[in-house]
Amino acid sequence: MARGSVSDEEMMELREAFAKVDTDGNGYISCNELNDLFKAACLPLPGYRVREITENLMATGDLDQDGKISFDEFIKVFHGLKSTEVAKTFRKAINKKEGICAIGGTSEQSSVGTQHSYSEEEKYAFVNWINKALENDPDCRHVIPMNPNTDDLFNAVGDGIVLCKMINLSVPDTIDERTINKKKLTPFTIQENLNLALNSASAIGCHVVNIGAEDLKEGKPYLVLGLLWQVIKIGLFADIELSRNEALIALLREGESLEDLMKLSPEELLLRWANYHLENAGCTKITNFSTDIKDSKAYYHLLEQVAPKGDEEGIPAVVIDMSGLREKDDIQRAECMLQQAERLGCRQFVTATDVVRGNPKLNLAFIANLFNKYPALHKPENQDIDWGALEGETREERTFRNWMNSLGVNPRVNHLYSDLSDALVIFQLYEKIKVPVDWNRVNKPPYPKLGGNMKKLENCNYAVDLGKNQAKFSLVGIAGQDLNEGNRTLTLALVWQLMRRYTLNILEDIGGGQKVNDDIIVNWVNTTLKEAQKSSSIASFKDPKISTSLPVLDLIDAIQPGSINYDLLKTENLDDEEKLNNAKYAISMARKIGARVYALPEDLVEVNPKMVMTVFACLMGKGMKRV
């Protein structure tokens, strides 16, 4: 199993698992460390069985016969043994290792009796982050501050308020505050808040397919932590993007184009940022945020490089005390380093133990937070750079990208065009709309250096072929090369048809397979409005009346009577700001009554017919379920 075919998320999990077994931190797993792992996990296994499993793992994993398992060999063990009894026991042992709490699974997805594990370290880190983020929010006083050493977090998310607030901190204005139920909560109003949180999380690109409101109400730890990590990460990564932070151009390497830099994921940009500063400090580069930072030395030098030097008005210098580097003990050294980070206001996400164990998820968050506060980069002057190429993504592009990510495509889509250039994500979307993909025809990464693009082009040709012949899409004038080269107009034409089909499929499933088109949706909307004695109606998805959002709001009130507070709305002679105000309320209310709406308020104000169609289709789905 090559590293290239393992997703970033999975690589993170594997590094975490590896770090738990590799107790001496030398980068290898020995036979003794495997024995210790099974002892520490207290699994009900006889001694001879532990010996057998250990020998089996060493025999399978130690490919170069050097008496120890490297990280690359460890990846192969995990993938090669996925279904065997040995692997199951091995995974169970890792999950039960210190700092990991194992709990019985009870959700519909997991039959009772299976084990779901969650990380105490993550819980501790997230609680401290949320406490700080919401410490001054009057709506959260009933739960903040939470105690990181108890299960406060899992109870605190149960009413949906904290989740809604954290989503808005990560992507401001996602949720209209007027739609959050805050006072005298009942089981029904709590359910509404949780609908609002889950559907809004989905709209910002969180994968929430297996999470229900009930899971959050019950505070299921592994689901709560999984959702919170996605929300927090989206917020941390928001500005690690060239169009939003032009100073990142300072990270361009010799012979590299702006386009190359724009293709990097936030994780890759963070690694490059750290190495840029380490290089300036004359230090060794790092290749990851786990094993390479365990001794805290890279962190020390990074802090020294980014700390304010006193050369900017109003920002006093902070001189990093490097004496802790001389500490012999790793934990002690990490603690001294974190005390210096605290002087910068950046002691977040990691404890000294998390650093020494190389917890990849929490160290990534620590670095991202440090970058956001002290990037210490300067936009290069006089460089021959096409600043015009730096335009950010359009709202429509962002909506498509968030939709894909919310469905759990792998790898995650950070840049719509470059991340679709091998069509792997497109194939996954075909499967979501019930178009069968012959995976034997698909080339998978890692692609060879020579001829790699040809492999991607073959994928793109197959993707266009599937669209034309299986999905029956209208793809006139679109060739595989257009997807491969990231032609905006033609890529969007395919992506829109994928999203449209996905939306209509949901309606057809609810309606027992009955075919649905635009006219059927418009007729349903008007009939529903009329039956509820509402005065509004729409002629099509281009109807100018939609810019007031009143037809949408009336439809929501028709589906769930009494849900809309009309006192909050302006209904006549609206200016642009009032239209936007209505639209924000409408989109959040649609999500609150249970419609998974991806469109943005601006789509209603500008009457973007594509996105307007998805709003009405999602509401129709909700309305049909009610019948």
Swiss-Prot record:
Which InterPro entries does the record cross-reference, listed alphabetically?
A: Actinin_actin-bd_CS, CH_dom, CH_dom_sf, EF-hand-dom_pair, EF_Hand_1_Ca_BS, EF_hand_dom, Fimbrin/Plastin
Residues with N-acetylalanine modification? 2
Q: Which residues carry this modification: Phosphothreonine?
A: 291, 353
Q: Which residues carry this modification: Phosphoserine?
A: 5, 7, 30, 257, 290, 323, 406, 474
* Stretches for region Actin-binding 1: 106-379
Spans annotated as Actin-binding 2: 380-624
What GO biological process, any one, is recorded here? regulation of intracellular protein transport
Molecular function via GO: actin filament binding; calcium ion binding; GTPase binding; identical protein binding; integrin binding
PTM note says: Phosphorylated on a serine residue in response to costimulation through TCR/CD3 and CD2 or CD28. Serine phosphorylation promotes association with the actin cytoskeleton and targeting to peripheral cell projections.
Q: Which CDD domains match?
A: CH_PLS2_rpt2, CH_PLS2_rpt4, CH_PLS_rpt1, EFh
Name its cellular compartments: Cytoplasm, Cytoskeleton; Cell projection; Cell junction; Cell projection, Ruffle membrane
Q: Which GO terms describe its cellular component?
A: actin cytoskeleton; actin filament; cytoplasm; cytosol; filopodium; focal adhesion; glial cell projection; perinuclear region of cytoplasm
What highest taxon heads this organism's lineage?
Eukaryota
Query: What PROSITE patterns does this protein's entry cite?
Result: ACTININ_1, ACTININ_2, CH, EF_HAND_1, EF_HAND_2
Q: Where does Ca(2+) 1 bind?
A: 22, 24, 26, 28, 33
Q: Record-annotated residues binding Ca(2+) 2?
A: 62, 64, 66, 68, 73
Q: Which UniProt keywords apply?
A: Acetylation, Actin-binding, Calcium, Cell junction, Cell membrane, Cell projection, Cytoplasm, Cytoskeleton, Membrane, Metal-binding, Phosphoprotein, Repeat
User: Which residues are annotated as modified residue Phosphotyrosine in the UniProt record?
Assistant: 28, 124
Residue(s) carrying N6-acetyllysine:
76, 88, 294, 297, 361, 472, 542, 579
Q: Where is the EF-hand domain positioned along the sequence?
A: 9-44, 49-84
Per UniProt, what is one Pfam family of this protein? Answer: EF-hand_7
**Protein's membrane topology:** Peripheral membrane protein
Record domain Calponin-homology (CH): where: 120-236, 264-375, 394-503, 515-624
Protein's job? Actin-binding protein. Plays a role in the activation of T-cells in response to costimulation through TCR/CD3 and CD2 or CD28. Modulates the cell surface expression of IL2RA/CD25 and CD69.
Provide the assembly information: Monomer. Interacts with AIF1. Interacts with actin.
Q: What is this protein called?
A: Plastin-2
Question: From what organism does this protein derive?
Answer: Mus musculus
| Annotated gene | Lcp1
